[in-house]
Design a protein with these regions (language model features):
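C-terminal accessory/tail domains of diverse enzymes
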Residues: 1-78, 91-272
Length: 272
């Protein structure tokens, strides 16, 4: 049953910001981060670190701006190895809501990859790694990692997760208790839902631009709220539509406010 009480102002989210040019050790030593923020290591980065936020709401976004300013002052930079991950609180999701989230994300995923680029940049997935760390739902279905049609037919969470992970149900408790599983390297990471209670969106490129991150967080929140609050799912787009201006349809489909719509226009994200 849809959860009509979820709002964009109250829904909690978190961000993970990957950067290079400042090592984990130096970041821990020199950065005066807001309370609850932490620095972690990431082996995929060159002389880099990952900055992880505590749970936030949109009213706390000034903390993100503060952290990005700190990083720039200390010489941080981003490369094709860097990304931004957005976690959204998974509270309130039942089986049908999770199905709708998968359907809605898949429907707009070609546009999500366009939006996921930093301003005037190529998405890191185009740099020879074929979205290695943020696989599209369509690719995961096509290569047999997950039976998408079977997911939509599942009548219980156990059956849904069997098909999401591609394992028998007796293996699920072991998988749920582990932070790491290969399926976390998908653009929509639902392993995070089982491990820490969040839905993770891994599509986004590295950036030190707060406006990029604000737009991406808004997109993720709107996808989650659409899936929680409305039984009707988004209609999939045809390949040719990814080359047209989709902003009107995106705004209508996700319920973007006029201010949110301007947010995407202002940063020259690729709509055509």
């Amino acid at each position: 049953m849809p959860n009509g009480n979820a709002t964009i102002e109250s829904r909690r989210f978190g961000v993970e910001i990957e950067v290079e040019g400042i090592s984990t050790e130096r970041a821990r030593r020199e950065l005066r981060l807001p309370a609850g923020w932490k620095v972690t290591s990431d082996g995929s980065l060159y002389d880099g670190s990952e900055i992880v936020s505590p749970p936030l709401t949109l009213g706390d976004f000034g903390q993100v701006e503060q952290v990005l300013s700190l990083l720039k002052r200390h010489g941080a930079r981003v490369s094709e190895r860097c990304s931004v991950h957005v976690h959204v609180d998974g509270n309130g999701f039942d089986l049908e809501g999770i199905k709708r989230l998968v359907q809605n994300t898949r429907a707009y995923e070609p546009w999500v990859y366009q939006i996921a680029r930093g301003a005037d940049a190529e998405h890191r997935g185009r740099n020879g790694n074929h979205y290695r760390y943020c696989k599209p739902i369509e690719e995961v279905h096509r290569n047999g990692e997950t039976d998408y049609d079977g997911l939509m037919k599942a009548r219980s969470f156990k059956r849904f997760w069997e098909r999401w992970y591609g394992v028998p149900r007796q293996e699920l408790p072991r998988i749920f208790s582990s932070k790491y599983h290969p399926c976390r390297y998908r653009g929509l990471n639902l392993h995070s839902f089982n491990y820490r209670g969040t839905v993770e969106f891994r599509y986004f490129d590295g950036t030190l631009n707060p406006a990029d991150i604000r737009a991406w967080v808004t997109l993720c929140l709107r996808l989650v709220l659409k899936s929680l609050n409305e039984a009707r799912v988004l209609r999939g787009i045809k390949p040719m539509e990814t080359r047209r201006n989709p902003l009107y349809r995106l705004a209508q489909g996700l319920g973007l406010t006029a201010e949110e719509r301007r947010m995407f226009q202002h940063h020259k994200l690729v709509w055509k």
